[in-house]
């Protein structure tokens, strides 16, 4: 694992800088695109999420769910071409009413970063997230300190004995518990916590994506 980090460190740090740039330079529309990507990725894959965003990008701000479904089906981009667009539009409607789509300002309104993640994961009108994808979204817009405990990361942690089971955590309490175990593990092996998440993911997928 340390050797993998050493071999991919340059690529991983480049990717993390790209995430930082999304927050420093990106518009609210860009932040919304990243959130939509994470909604598409949930229950699917990172690659499927990327392909889906590419297929519906012109529709993300104003398109309806039916138009998104047509675009996804035409591109063969997603396994849930009807449900995911409904999640996207429903969540977009919520953000319009909650903050006028001013996502940067809304995210900055939280003094506690964990309260911010709790809001994304627990707000019922934010569809299709949960703690993993809320963490994924925050990481992808440059927020540090949140673990993305997907199946790849969980399998790696189980294989090296950090956790007993590779089953993804299903509650907030369990998510925070595993996250703390990952933080301690990163400290023990001398690898930056945010970099380690991408190391583990790349060990199972063979690439450093997002």
Regions found by a protein language model. Name each.
Residues 1-22, 85, 100-118, 123-210:
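C-terminal accessory module of base-excision DNA glycosylases/AP lyases that mediates lesion recognition
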Residues 40-48, 60-61, 96, 145, ...:
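Short alpha-helix boundary/capping elements
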Residues 1-78, 84:
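Structure-specific DNA junction-binding interface
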Residues 34-43, 89-93, 139, 198-205:
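Short, hydrophobic/amphipathic alpha-helical patches that form generic packing surfaces
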Residues 55-126:
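Alpha-helical ds-nucleic-acid-binding substructure associated with the helix-hairpin-helix region
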Residues 53, 92, 179-183:
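A generic structural signal for ordered secondary structure
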């Amino acid at each position: 694992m340390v050797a993998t980090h050493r071999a991919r460190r340059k690529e991983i740090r480049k990717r993390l800088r790209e995430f930082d740039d999304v927050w420093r330079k990106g518009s609210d529309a860009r932040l919304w695109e990243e959130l939509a990507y994470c909604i598409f990725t949930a229950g699917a894959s990172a690659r499927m999420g990327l392909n889906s965003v590419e297929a519906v990008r012109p529709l993300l701000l104003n398109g309806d769910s039916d138009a998104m479904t047509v675009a996804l089906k035409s591109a063969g981009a997603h396994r849930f071409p009807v449900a995911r667009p409904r999640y996207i539009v429903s969540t977009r409607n919520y953000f319009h009413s909650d903050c006028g789509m001013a996502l940067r300002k809304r995210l900055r309104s939280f003094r506690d970063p964990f309260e911010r993640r709790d809001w994304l994961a627990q707000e019922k009108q934010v569809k299709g997230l949960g703690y993993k994808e809320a963490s994924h979204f925050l990481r992808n817009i440059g927020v540090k300190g949140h673990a993305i405990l997907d199946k790849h990361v969980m399998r790696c942690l189980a294989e090296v004995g950090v956790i007993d089971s590779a089953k993804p955590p299903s509650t907030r309490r369990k998510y925070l518990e595993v996250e703390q175990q990952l933080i301690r593990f990163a400290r023990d092996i001398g690898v930056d916590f945010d970099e380690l998440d991408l190391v583990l993911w790349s060990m199972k997928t063979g690439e450093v994506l997002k």
